[in-house]
């Protein structure tokens, strides 16, 4: 019987060897598919009979034939999945297919390179920036030279992954170009030097437009004439022009402008720079110009490192540190810090100026804007100097305010009646700035607040216009002027002038017509000769009789009890008719730092003694001061009387008619009206021999027509504030320290004047 298994196996092996040798190299199959399929197909057909001799011989022959391609084949085998070790026949077929694919891909690559070179040769466009393409968008001609940006493939043998990527890129080159980010085709930036040269003229132009006439010439170097001989352009491309203020001729260079300016100058007044053609008629202009040549900037800002050549530029620069816009348009929302820019706005649009603010943000109705005039900065309504420090000129604000003080009394002499609110507000700008620890000069036309310690009566009597109601200085506005450099952030939005006018209107409304007549008569009856005699007499008394501070109590107990018995309805009202000769004027040598209260009471007695001699004549006589005729004539006030147990009763408390008599900001004139009104209603108990008697009871109560009978008014002489409530007055006086009235009695902090104390009380919590 024939063995079919042996025969079939032998025939199959021979057929398989013949099939592999003839057709394996010509059949194209995927490596994985060929590997798996051949492995699966051949594994079940494996015969248990060993038949590996034919395969080993065939593999040895193939290795000898392709020995020169062994190195690239090793690389491909390392990057591709290796076939199974059990199937050597599948490995042989895989190697043959991979070699054929590699050859085809190399041919495709060569054709691609040739086509790309030919395309680049026929369709080459110049690269660079296209002005029609917006920055950041793809260039429309980018696809023509985009291929040049990629490295060309090398003809050397490459891996399978690289070849596959090149083939994919060839088939979808347009898609890749659409997906790749666009190249940066924005134009190159200008050099830093040119940009700085464009910005510098604009900056200098801004300084010229905002500063004074002293800055109309920009900085030029000593050895470079391009800035003065060539036109200057700003960053917007606008050329700088130089316009003659005399004839209106416009020049485009500084040299031409200076040459034209010389024609308007007198030959004997021409001042020329030794280093350039600059000419001027003013010495300070030439001085500033020479400082620019030498690069000297002596003026420096105290808040930053800015330096400049003159004070005007520094004042203009300091406005950049302020948040107050002093100039506002009445017809629109335009606001600026510089008057020059404000005038340009008003001229351009035909608008009207609004309320001008001071440097601290306080409205100043006394200033007006001369829109079409040549004045730099605002001007005052009365034609006098400017009372605001924000005009941009070189002079300081303090000198302007002191000059206005000399003009104000002349205008107020012609206004005996109550002025309107605008005039009252405008009068606030005319008071000098006097420190709280210094005595004003005797010839000062207007006196400050009663915080000045040593004032002579001569300074009061030398001002015939003092009793005018327009001179009643509101305390808050005056104190702000004394401390105009302080930052009062909570009070920036307050119209302080309106508040002051309301206070004055309320005080003037309480005055009787007879008081106004008396004040007018007092102005008319004073003469220069009498003032000189009175000045000499009072100066002699002030030197001979210094203030006695050795008294233990400010008020005698008997007199205080008598005052309570005679005035039970007003136990806390202090009648200012109560001074004696024992505490006369404060010495004019300013030896004692009294805050003005003794001066006020002493002047009261002198004025009252003159009224007792002639009741119709309300002026200070030159006779010796008689004894007091008040119920508490023996009272000796102390500087620190508010620290005693009777602080609320012993402090300076006045009625409304006393406030009317306060014709100046000092307390001396304030008490003069009180004494004149009270002495005219006295019962004749005032005699020159009763100075030591403290039991006079003739003038028991004030007249029924006086405001003291209607209601009590308490006044703090240090802050010049009135209180209608004794509790509020006592609380306020509790903040004044005994040794220093402007030192907080609660925490001990030293404050800068009454406004500083008020700000301290408002900002800090005290237990």
From Swiss-Prot:
Residues 528-537 have a biased composition (Acidic residues). GO terms for biological process: segmentation. GO terms for molecular function: DNA binding; zinc ion binding. It comes from the Eukaryota. GO terms for cellular component: nucleus. Residues 39-51 have a biased composition (Polar residues). This is Protein hunchback. The lineage of its organism: Eukaryota, Metazoa, Ecdysozoa, Arthropoda, Hexapoda. The gene is hb.
